[in-house]
Amino acid sequence: MALDKSIVVNFTSRLFADELAALQSKIGSVLPLGDCHRLQNIQALGLGCVCSRETSPDYIQIMQYLSKCTLAVLEEVRPDSLRLTRMDPSDNLQIKNVYAPFFQWDSNTQLAVLPPFFSRKDSTIVLESNGFDLVFPMVVPQQLGHAILQQLLVYHIYSKISAGAPDDVNMAELDLYTTNVSFMGRTYRLDVDNTDPRTALRVLDDLSMYLCILSALVPRGCLRLLTALVRHDRHPLTEVFEGVVPDEVTRIDLDQLSVPDDITRMRVMFSYLQSLSSIFNLGPRLHVYAYSAETLAASCWYSPR
């Protein structure tokens, strides 16, 4: 007997006609839920609990919520309720590409479920009948998700520098290179204007510090090996890195090597790498094996990590 994975979300009031039509256009989309219970209320649906209109978005906090919550596919919309199908690991699913902005999917690709990086407004259906904003996540190709996170991290680092020393950062240049991403010939602007620098992306403060610490934790033996390979073996792969080895690396006293010290460095470095990977692995993921550009429907299987 097949396991019933249906989740029913009841509204507090019947939907208006335009709200009903807007939600029906989103059938096939992925929505987060606070838990996996069969019957839930509307307050548990969507990203409104971590991405409300009253607060500035903290995208890393939203990503952490997406990694812990229950995900489901919107299957049916009625005037008084929604029906969704819970997504379990390795499940085969049918979803649709009904997100704004629109990014083309294709077969044999990986999709990431991410916060609404480009516009909370465009990812929200306002249900005035229920006094509730239903905020949808984005489902985008994984390589685009990586590009977004990389640019947000650089933007945040330089914004912090500018807060302490405004003359040290060319904000026009920072805006040009970090607030826009290109994908398949089109350019999209990230929603960084509405973030509060005092709270938004606060987890990236730790991540930025982790990156700085990692640069100091690289075992000295690794640096010695790097310089030896670049200078002598001339392997094609090491030639790629020859031009980007910082000058300070060549000035380190590599003759003072210590195996116990390098073991400690390696152990701590792995600890910080695991902290970084918990953010940057872009879980959860959807592995698409069939996609129709005409119907925007995709067949995929689900991986929480």
UniProtKB/Swiss-Prot annotation:
GO terms assigned for molecular function: structural molecule activity
UniProt cross-references to InterPro entries, sorted A to Z: Herpes_capsid_2
Record-annotated disulphide pairs: none
Assigned keywords, A-Z: Capsid protein, Host nucleus, Virion
Coiled-coil annotated spans: none
Compartment(s): Virion; Host nucleus
Domain of life: Viruses
Signal sequence interval, chain numbering: none
Entry GO CC: host cell nucleus; viral capsid
Family: Belongs to the herpesviridae TRX2 protein family.
Self-association and partners: Interacts with TRX1 and major capisd protein/MCP.
Role this protein plays: Structural component of the T=16 icosahedral capsid. The capsid is composed of pentamers and hexamers of major capsid protein/MCP, which are linked together by heterotrimers called triplexes. These triplexes are formed by a single molecule of triplex protein 1/TRX1 and two copies of triplex protein 2/TRX2. Additionally, TRX1 is required for efficient transport of TRX2 to the nucleus, which is the site of capsid assembly.
Protein name: Triplex capsid protein 2
